[in-house]
Amino acid sequence: MAGAKEIKTKIASVKNTQKITSAMEMVAASKMRRAQDRMTASRPYAESMRKVIGHVAQGSLEYKHPYLEVREAKRVGYIVVASDRGLCGGLNVNLFKKVVSDVKNWKAQGVEVEFCPIGARSVQFFKAFGGKVQAHASGLGDAPKLADLIGTVRVMLQAYNEGKLDRLYVVFNKFVNTMTQTPVIEQLLPLPKSEDDEIAHHWDYIYEQDPKDLLDTLLVRYVESQVYQGVVENIASEQAARMVAMKAATDNAGTLIDDLQLVYNKARQAAITQELSEIVSGAAAV
């Protein structure tokens, strides 16, 4: 059994760690609330864009934009959004597992795969993974702006325009609630059709004046908005996962302190008993 002094030092060390994890939990909770506000504010725009584009994909246009045409899948691109920092449980690991599983399915069909990682952890993973990285972005902070992503996203759009990609997906952790964050893979290009069949079959848009000019701008903005929404969703998910992970670490530290305190008390009691035995033995010898 370790000595009482050694155990006491370990208890002090664990208490210091507990203070750090508790502080990180509170910081993550505060950041999560702000991230949730940004996510909630941007969701209606992203969802409205998705509905509009879904109707466009269903509509019968004289001008058929390249983003509406379904090509044979020979090359697939993934924009993978992960966190810049760790200490957020299995958030990034679960996301990467989902991507790798999807990539294996494509490669089994002889399809080439390229990546655009967003977030330091994503960049680090896919460079080690050995995939072809077309573009990347990291260090976006807790309150990223759309302008921070446009350059990176347009590299992938350019590759799609040039026929170097036939499918484009965005991957991120969707924020469900504080305890649940779900990794999702959403198709960006070619444009997915609206799932709302009832509305799609009852009306269509009238384009004035030239649908080409409008769609060229609208469809690019759509892709950018969906990637941005994925980033803000992932930030909210990251902070929620970190808050939960730090709470678990704080609770575990408390349990460890209690266990160490019990060991310390036993060691101290054993030391006192040993001293008393030595005193009694010495007195008997005299």
Swiss-Prot record:
State one molecular function term (GO).
proton-transporting ATP synthase activity, rotational mechanism
UniProt xrefs under InterPro entries: ATP_synth_F1_ATPase_gsu, ATP_synth_F1_gsu, ATP_synth_F1_gsu_CS
State if Membrane is listed as a keyword.
yes
Superkingdom in the source lineage:
Bacteria
Question: Where does the protein end up?
Answer: Cell inner membrane
Assigned keywords, A-Z: ATP synthesis, Cell inner membrane, Cell membrane, CF(1), Hydrogen ion transport, Ion transport, Membrane, Transport
Q: How does it sit in the membrane?
A: Peripheral membrane protein
Q: Name one GO cellular component term.
A: proton-transporting ATP synthase complex
GO BP field: proton motive force-driven plasma membrane ATP synthesis
The residues forming the signal peptide are none
The record's section on CDD domains has: F1-ATPase_gamma (cd12151)
Q: Which family does it belong to?
A: Belongs to the ATPase gamma chain family.
Q: Which HAMAP family match?
A: ATP_synth_gamma_bact
What is said about its interaction partners and assembly? F-type ATPases have 2 components, CF(1) - the catalytic core - and CF(0) - the membrane proton channel. CF(1) has five subunits: alpha(3), beta(3), gamma(1), delta(1), epsilon(1). CF(0) has three main subunits: a, b and c.
Functional description taken from the UniProt entry: Produces ATP from ADP in the presence of a proton gradient across the membrane. The gamma chain is believed to be important in regulating ATPase activity and the flow of protons through the CF(0) complex.
Q: What is this protein called?
A: ATP synthase gamma chain
User: What organism is this sequence from?
Assistant: Shewanella amazonensis (strain ATCC BAA-1098 / SB2B)
